[in-house]
Amino acid sequence: MREAGEEKVAWKYFTRDVVPFAAMFAVECATVGSNTLFKAATLRGLSFYVFVFYSYIVSTLLLLPLSVIFGRSRRLPAAKSPLFFKIFLLGLVGFMSQIAGCKGIAYSSPTLASAISNLTPAFTFTLAVIFRMEQVRLRSSATQAKIIGAILSISGALVVVLYKGPQVLASASFTTVLPTVTLHQQLTSIESSWIIGGLLLASQYFLISVWYILQTRVMEVYPEEITVVFFYNLFATLISVPVCLFAESNLTSWVLKPDISLAAIIYSGVFVSLFSALTHTWGLHLKGPVYISLFRPLSIAIAVAMGAIFLGDALHLGSVIGSMILCIGFYTVIWGKAREDTIKTVAGSEQSPLLLTHIIEDGAFPLS
């Protein structure tokens, strides 16, 4: 009986902690890959309005059969239901964040986007407190850690945006990757509007935090991940049609060729608008908005490597210092969150000595 109980607890730990951790890490890899491909495609002339529109089209078409096959276990609400209005808001917020993010990367680089993404835990925690999804006890060490971490994250982001500094790693020209780009300056973010890009990216990650909060509320009412994500992408597509067609009036820009632009659009539609949205929606339902946002700092190292390999981006001192401050803030927030979750779990396990023993033995895992 004891062994069976331990196996049950271990399986529960695996499904509720290990699997979400691995899934969120995969999402960060997919997101950085999409940012890098998008930046490379813009250097070849891809309009970010075209990119956003076609990406939503791809994900919506792929989700349609999935929602029919797997998403009908719960009856759909009426068309006039407040739920559909909330999902429409999800589509609007998601579309706005995509536009801000694409424009921000076009002005700067995927590395800056990954650095600024560390604001997401601070934004999400603040919004979660405002909407009473997180408890604030000022005398609690967990709450103090989350507040200090949020302040450090914002400070680090300001350093990244406002202080570029000298090069730590020199940029390199990779003409084999982008053969039509001949000027070295086109391959780096040196000539880009760093501050404007940073502000746009900060706006993107604030909107993403709003999306997390709103999506969590939607999942509380209608916990059908595939159906919700399908309608989210459908509404985002409908919103993007007039906006993108009006903003990008050059018809030749809408003609796609089998090159890196098409690859970037398909990749984004499959791995960001579909896979990442589904995974985040599932994670929000399982773990909550603050947990999902805590994985953003993992993208920094991935973005630096991809930017250096595929874009020839230089690494600047300001990005290094700011990212270090951001990471300290991130791990401070995650420590506070882990401590808070541990206290809640132990408090709820007073009647289950076996579960309590398992928690104590596995105390080395900060995300449990």
Curated annotation (Swiss-Prot):
Main location class: membrane
InterPro entries listed in its UniProt record: EamA_dom, WAT1-related
Official protein name in the record: WAT1-related protein At5g40240
The keyword Repeat is assigned to this record: yes
Keywords: Membrane, Repeat, Transmembrane, Transmembrane helix
Pfam families from the UniProt entry: EamA (PF00892)
Membrane topology, as annotated: Multi-pass membrane protein
Gene Ontology molecular function, alphabetical: transmembrane transporter activity
Family recorded in the similarity comment: Belongs to the drug/metabolite transporter (DMT) superfamily. Plant drug/metabolite exporter (P-DME) (TC 2.A.7.4) family.
Subcellular location: Membrane
Segments forming domain EamA: 33-161, 208-334
Cellular component annotations (GO), alphabetically ordered: membrane
Sequence intervals crossing the membrane: 18-38, 50-70, 82-102, 111-131, 142-162, 194-214, 226-246, 260-280, 292-312, 315-335
Organism: Arabidopsis thaliana (Mouse-ear cress)
Domain of life: Eukaryota
Keyword Cell inner membrane (UniProt): no
